[in-house]
């Protein structure tokens, strides 16, 4: 028998936090089925990263994610610099799949990427 979620696309909620080591982040991944919302507890995957603004120039060797229970997985990644990174989750179990999530990594925090440059300010015209 094949589990109901086996052929279902995966949804990954990723939270990364800076460690005491420069450019090293602890990432927690919560996996669920995209449609069913069911926890995926038996996945095997690696976490790698590419910098979308500089394709092929900056990428991180994938590291294995380790299950900590209830559909939660941990991976520690080391980046080359701060900025926007596309985290790539490459699955081998329950089936081959790829999930990509863009995050902005800074010295103090990690936040989801919304495609906007957060370094500029909007100026309002005063009439």
Protein language model features and the residues they cover:
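N-terminal soluble domains immediately following signal/targeting peptides that reside
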Residues: 5-127
């Amino acid at each position: 028998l094949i589990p109901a979620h086996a052929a279902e696309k995966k949804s990954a909620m990723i939270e990364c936090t800076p460690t005491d080591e420069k450019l090293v982040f602890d990432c927690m991944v919560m996996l669920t089925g995209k449609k069913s919302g069911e926890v995926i507890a038996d996945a095997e995957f690696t976490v790698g990263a590419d910098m979308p603004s500089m394709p092929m120039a900056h990428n991180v060797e994938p590291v294995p994610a380790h299950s900590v229970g209830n559909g939660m997985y941990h991976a520690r990644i080391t980046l080359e610099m701060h900025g926007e990174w596309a985290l790539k989750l490459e699955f081998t179990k329950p089936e081959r799949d790829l999930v990509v999530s863009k995050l902005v990594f800074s010295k103090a925090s990690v936040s989801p990427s919304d495609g906007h440059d957060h370094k500029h300010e909007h100026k309002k015209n005063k009439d």
